[in-house]
Amino acid sequence: MIWVAVVITMLLFILVAKPTGIYLEKAFQGSKKLDKVFGPFEKLIFKITGVKEYNQTWKQYALSLVLLNGFMIVVVYFIFRLQGVLPLNPAHIEGMEPTLAFNTAISFMTDTNLQHYSGENGLSYLSQLIGITFLMFAAPATTLALVMAFIRGLAGKELGNFFVDFTRALTRVFLPIAFVTALVFVALGVPQTLDGAVTAQTIDGVKQSIVRGPVASFVSIKELGNNGGGFFGTNSTHPFENPGQMSNILQMMLMMLLPTALPFTYGRMVGNKKQGRILFVSLFMVFLLGFITITTSELNGNPALNAMGIEHVQGSTEGKEVRFGTVFSSLYATVTTAAETGAVNTMHDTLTPIGGLVPLVNMMLNTVYGGVGAGFVNIITYAIIAVFISGLMVGRTPEFLGKKIEGKEMKLIAVTILFHPLLILGFSALALSTSLGTDAISNLGFHGLTQIVYEYTSSAVNNGSGFEGLGDATTFWNITTGLVMFLGRYFSLVTMLAVAASLKEKTVVPETVGTFRTDNGLFGGIFIGTIVIVGALTFFPMLVLGPIAEFLTLK
């Protein structure tokens, strides 16, 4: 029965992807029906804010994005610092210390949602609503807007206006879907209230304080926007965030909704629907491989415990919730790191070595399918590299969407590809070279190395999940992960927008018999191979020293 439920869940991922992709294309490219519904409200927003609907250059678009996000970071930083004297604070929670406020503001603005605090004890309701939830809408809207400009550039069209795209992302995508799904979560048992904690008497007569709050509205955008931060410290393992299997499946669907839809949106916008389908299918195969690997490892149990003769019919159940089971916990871990969300319904630090390797590799690849917008930019980065390598092998000038890929584009792409591992491995090396970093390790040896690398990988790709045995609530970790989150977010977005702008100016080369097609199975295979060779092998030495060495030791 459990496998039937898994297959149905997978089919739901596939069935909703294309219709959502079509909707996104209409929402951003102009649809008379949608303009009639949302247009008046959007025009009112533009009038109040003074936004003028004109086409921006790539530099203007990127600058608008960075400045708006920077302004939001500053505003929310002061909300966190001053929450102790602000209203909606029934628990009388004090303001955050400076480095934690710095880390948290950047974390939620970059769609990472790395949390070095416990949700219910670290933030007031005002901070949760005005600070956290506000950024949970703004962060994915930022990258969804950018990916639309990116695709327009690839299609040879004007990039558009960031503020217009940002507004449409909010009004036409995130607000309506989040509102409806929040109501569904309430129906499934997730609380939604501004009342403070309640005191309950347990069956043994002890009084217990039960924290609640506006959880349903928080969870809906948490998953839809690939945010991942928890209202409660234990995230989606908490019964108030994720009461049962229905809410669990809905959360996974929301995480996968926009990332899986974007290949179809891309195909329609560039006039090559088949290429969009090839990208979707290729990535889904990689996703399935990851799910099969982690599930097999978790069902086989912990090798050390198996050697002691301990029963493991349910697999490795350490750190897992009984109401979800091993299989759906494995699926959730695969989804949350493939879609770069970071929400967890099981403790990733307790996964078996190979089980923990899958979420880590998903994040290192950052393409299967990646987070809202930013993930798809990475997908196209690897697609262009695949075309470039193929062109070199046959002695032809590489072409993508009929446009020549030349030195300027490849230099920007090369810098983008190299920057990602440099951030992760460079800061990991820094942490390992000082007691400020190594003192946070709770498990010495191979697993301790994995804890550190996982933290910086999660930060760099804006995932936010963690091996929570790491004691990261310190000044060192707050500052270093904050820097990694900021650089990991904006550097690649700006450089790849420059690539799209460069391709926009190029004329389309007529297709010939010798043109390397990017809408067939051959390209799909080369695309997957490029992801594995360029992406996974970059981190292979670290994976050998971390989870693989731990696995061999346990064996």
UniProtKB/Swiss-Prot annotation:
NCBIfam families xrefs: kdpA
Localization, UniProt: Cell membrane
The entry's keywords: Cell membrane, Ion transport, Membrane, Potassium, Potassium transport, Transmembrane, Transmembrane helix, Transport
Protein's UniProt keywords contain Cell membrane: yes
Name of the featured protein: Potassium-transporting ATPase potassium-binding subunit
Coiled-coil segments on the chain, per record: none
Protein topology in the membrane: Multi-pass membrane protein
Summary of subunit composition and partner proteins: The system is composed of three essential subunits: KdpA, KdpB and KdpC.
Principal cellular location given in the protein's record: membrane
Function: Part of the high-affinity ATP-driven potassium transport (or Kdp) system, which catalyzes the hydrolysis of ATP coupled with the electrogenic transport of potassium into the cytoplasm. This subunit binds the extracellular potassium ions and delivers the ions to the membrane domain of KdpB through an intramembrane tunnel.
UniProt similarity note: Belongs to the KdpA family.
GO terms for cellular component: plasma membrane
Entry-linked Pfam families: KdpA
PANTHER family, sorted: POTASSIUM-TRANSPORTING ATPASE A CHAIN, POTASSIUM-TRANSPORTING ATPASE POTASSIUM-BINDING SUBUNIT
TM segment ranges: 2-22, 60-80, 130-150, 173-193, 246-266, 278-298, 374-394, 412-432, 483-503, 525-545
One term of GO molecular function: potassium ion binding
